[in-house]
Amino acid sequence: MIKKCSNKSIVIAGAGLTGLMSAIKLRQLYPDKEIIVFDRAHHVGGMYSSLSYSQSVMFDYGMHIIYESCNKEIDDLYTKVMPKSEWHMYENNEKDIAGLFFNGRLQTYSHYIDLRTFSQKDRNIFTGSLMHMLDKPDSKSPNNVMDFLRNQFGCEIADVVHRPILHRMYGIDPEDLDVFAIKATALERVVLFDSAIMLDLMKSSKLRERLAFPDQLNLPPIRTNNQKALYPRKFGMVHFVDRLRSYLESIDVDVLTETDIQHIRQQRGRIKQITLNSKKSGIKNIAVDRLLWTVGWPLLSKQLNLDISDLKFQKGPEIIFVNLSFNRPLLMERLYYFYCYDDGFATFRVTNYSNYCPGAAQDGWFPLCVELWPSKIGKKRTVMEINECIELAVDELKRFGVIGVDHKLIFAKVENDVSEFPMPSLENKKSLKVIRSRVEDLEIKNLTVAGIMASDDLFFIPDILNDAFSKLHSL
């Protein structure tokens, strides 16, 4: 039996953080409207949810801290949903303590590439390369990531240092990568000078855009905002996500999980009705006042019956989450996480949960997540056995120096079918632009698109939420 909603509803496709936070704002803007959020997953929050292996064993999907949007109407919602007393709040130099494994060394002082690890001869060449670029005008529209990096640092640094890293990470010619590739792991700066010299050099905006301070915990107060980082005091981002869902239900927002969209009916430039198929409640036809779409342009084009068979999409690196617990703290100093750029490693990132959530370490368990990109070592996740993933992660942790002979593995689980990292290629960006244009050509008056890549370079949640809330205000 098909159920039908008589009143027009505001419908939100996607129950990730964008969809859920937008639902709160829409309720504030439209107190009398029916609001429905749906998602095909069995849980809300997307990658901001958590994996629960038992009542006492939980892991996040790698590194997920909430960074404020520096927009009061957004940031106030976090403490509206969950009081300040239930959050860890980090600011200034403790907001994001990140590192990097590069040139065989774990950098606990900066996640930017440290060129001081090269020979003095190379460092002299790199310094000359960078200084030479300062006299040239900045490129306003670089063609690809290598154009940007050469303009930023000069050919000697871009081609010798960055090119092999980017090729190793994404498996395609870096000339075919969009500029956005530098933002995913912060490749826009390098460490080249010690702290004393940098204190003087930072007075120049051109140098500040290119050079990183080599001691993140003692970085001078030069930030232009007071952005904070938030994480629940109780380990597991799901604790916030669950509270968010409960809050939405308390303000009469319907949240439907395990629900697919079957059909969108358009008429005279408007979406009139959508058909949802819910595992719990069956098929439902919903009269639509407005549709907020947060789950990507390709899925939207499919639902709107647009032909995109002429477009190509390159798949990004496959991700394997290896969740481990050891019997003692990891040898990472204060790092929340670090990346790995070196050859011969499958690791993309290691996250040490107890460094930003002390409650994660309980009963002698110290949890961490190793995110493997098997393509970095020429493998596919489909052919990697569970034990192979665990052994690989543990071996690389030893090579990083993060665990020693006294560390005993007491828990291990592998998630090898969760996600892929978005490929920041020129081809993908071009295809998304074409889809966006084709959707916009339909001139659907009551459709709003938000979320990752809703517009160029939208990837991080603070930017995504600012973009979404701006669009909601203009409905």
Model region roles, listed by residue range:
Residues 2, 8-37:
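N-terminal Rossmann-like FAD-binding beta1-loop-alpha1 element of flavoenzymes
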Residues 89, 93-94, 257-259, 265:
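Short loop/edge segments at beta-strand edges and connector loops
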Residues 127-262:
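Active-site/ligand-binding neighborhood in enzyme catalytic cores
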